[in-house]
Design a protein with these regions (language model features):
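Terminal presequence/propeptide segments associated with secretion/organelle targeting
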Residues: 1-575
Length: 575
């Protein structure tokens, strides 16, 4: 049996190619594919082309299905066609055989504890810990790539594509094709957005976006069918396999077809997004032409030593399972654009994710050869913690990230400290001088000042002078109640101090315990014992032995490490 199909080879107009049916490939779960040989439009030389996914095939004058697969390094232009009956399941919400991505996500409390614990580790250990935390928020191994989509990439440097090659491949966007698809404007700039597109048509090129703005990332396939009500089906296979979804799509021009012995592909130039995908299932994708799907706005503020600040903006797909990865890729691009030499730098990172519970704000200052790795992995871990939280839909409204670079590795170490007096009365001020040593031995002195509360109890107290990470760990140990809501999780994140904070804390002994998501201090001995380890104690309860009395925080121009404890006595004046 012979028929014909439609696809775009250059420009925007679909062209006819010839189809010969070779047979039917039986498949599992009631799905079969039609095996075809194509010809015309130069397909004898190129073979079936990446970007032809969804190209409609007509047999006996009727729509039979869409080109959806081929084999690499084939000598004949042979491909597979997904029957249109299966594709229409994606419109109805059927497709009962769609297999969800396997993701071993942990509870939000466990993920938070792991992130907080990693915050104070040495750089190499911190990277290893963050990689473990980030793993559930990355595409799972073993997912079959959608091999006949043509990747679209603009503004993304090749170094970023290489770093995330494995992740992108699992999304069906192989990095070698992405590197070839980088916009002609070059890394760091996206092509100019052109005029509003015409309507989608069967056989026309279609691009679905994951990133759009100063950066572009997406995939180009072909529209299979458009109905009078504005609904359409495309691709003939899944894009990301995510079921119900909202992604922006646009009509697309084909600039050229790149012939390759492995797999030829289309070089595409998409128009501005105007429509939306609404379903992404095994037999294909579907959508509507009623409006454009919104994206999560991301704004980067780049500050480099000796240069003007720069702002970059783009949208990120609002799908929780890929949002963390796309945010991490965006951060990597911004770091490269701010300073393309990653070794021996100091990076100040501020990340704010707007949610229904308020903004999640995280700050840190990183220095040394692992600074870039830590910044990227922290972004994916925090993005996953928010987007994939177990409490409620975060309704992420936007992301703002500030990156400030300084040349060279810069850090302080706490060497020594001394107090103005070993005894202090309630209501008085306790002063301490802190000696700091730089990376090459240079020394500086800082002074911290704490006012002892008038209601402070008499007796022994401990002055702890420490870096931000150590202080964060101490705060969590003194108030270890796990988060029980999205708002509680946000407050926990805000308690993590950046590495460039030098903190003086005055602690006094206390009896307390955590219970029901709260930490109780100054308890009677019997109550503290019952709540911490008494009969029927639950795993969320733990004992608390100290409480904060006063605190002073200094912001330094570089990270600081180390801690010192000084015992003092709180004593009221005797009349």
């Amino acid at each position: 049996m012979k028929g014909w199909g439609l696809t775009v080879m250059k420009g925007a107009a679909p062209e006819r190619f010839e189809v010969e049916v070779l047979g039917v490939l039986p498949n599992t779960l009631g799905r079969s594919r039609i095996l075809v040989k194509v010809s015309g439009l130069g397909l004898e030389r190129t073979g079936v082309i990446a970007g032809m996914s969804g190209s409609p095939v007509y047999l006996d004058g009727k729509l039979a299905g869409a080109v959806s697969a081929t084999w690499a390094f084939g000598k004949d232009p042979v491909g597979q066609v997904t029957p249109i009956e299966n594709m229409l399941e994606s419109v109805s919400g059927g497709a009962p055989f769609s297999i969800p991505r396997a993701r071993a996500t942990s509870s939000s409390a466990a993920a938070w504890e792991a992130l907080a614990a990693a915050h104070g580790l040495p750089p190499d250990e911190r990277v290893a810990a963050l990689e473990r935390i980030a793993a559930p928020y990355r595409p799972a191994a073993g997912r079959e790539a959608a091999s006949l989509l043509a990747p679209v990439s603009a503004g993304i440097p090749s170094a970023t594509l290489s770093r995330f090659a494995e992740d992108l491949g699992r999304l069906g966007l192989p990095a070698p094709f992405l590197a070839s698809a980088v916009g002609a404007a070059g890394a760091g700039r996206a092509p100019e957005t052109r005029a509003a597109p015409d309507k989608l048509v069967a056989g026309g090129a279609l691009t679905a976006f994951l990133l759009d703005g100063d950066l572009q990332l997406g995939a180009t396939g072909t529209v299979t069918r458009v109905d009078p009500d504005g609904s359409f089906v495309a691709f003939g296979h899944p894009f990301l396999g995510m079921g119900e979804i909202e992604l922006p799509v646009a009509t697309t021009d084909v600039v050229e077809v790149f012939a390759s012995s492995m797999l030829s592909f289309k070089l595409a130039a998409p128009h501005a997004p105007a429509y939306r995908l609404t379903s992404d299932r095994d037999p294909g994708v579907s959508g509507r032409m009623d409006r454009v799907a919104p994206m999560i706005p991301v704004r980067f503020r780049l500050e480099a030593a000796g240069g003007p600040a720069k702002d970059l903006r783009w949208g990120v797909a609002p799908a929780p399972s890929i949002f963390p990865l796309l945010l991490a890729m965006s951060t990597d691009v911004a770091l490269l654009l701010n300073d393309p030499t990653p070794a021996q730098k100091t990076v100040a990172l501020r990340l704010s994710i707007g949610t229904a519970a308020g903004p999640f704000v995280y700050e840190d200052v990183l220095s040394g050869p692992r600074a870039r790795d830590i910044a990227i992995l922290t972004t994916i871990a925090l993005g996953g913690l928010v987007a994939d939280n177990e409490f409620e839909d975060p309704k992420i409204s936007g992301v703002e990230i500030t990156l400030a670079n300084a040349l060279g590795e810069r850090r302080f170490r706490v060497v020594d400290a001394g107090v103005s007096a070993r005894k202090v009365a309630p209501g008085q001020t306790l002063t301490a001088s802190v000696r700091l040593a730089g990376r090459r031995g240079e020394e500086e002195t800082r002074v911290v000042t704490l006012r002892v509360p008038r209601e402070a109890p008499e007796g022994r107290a401990t002055l702890v002078i420490a870096d931000g990470a150590a202080t964060s760990a101490a705060r969590l140990s003194l108030d270890p109640a796990p988060p029980r809501s999205l708002a509680g999780l946000r407050r926990m994140v805000e308690r993590l101090l950046p590495a460039n904070r030098l903190v003086a804390t005055l602690l006094v002994p206390a009896r307390g315990a955590t219970t029901g998501g709260a930490t109780l201090t100054a308890l009677p001995p019997s109550a503290a014992a019952i709540l911490s380890d008494g009969e029927g104690a639950d795993p969320g309860r733990s004992a608390v032995s100290s409480r904060f009395l006063a605190e002073d925080i200094l912001t330094l121009d570089r990270p600081v490490a180390g801690s010192i404890r000084i015992e003092v006595e709180i004593e009221r004046p005797r009349s």
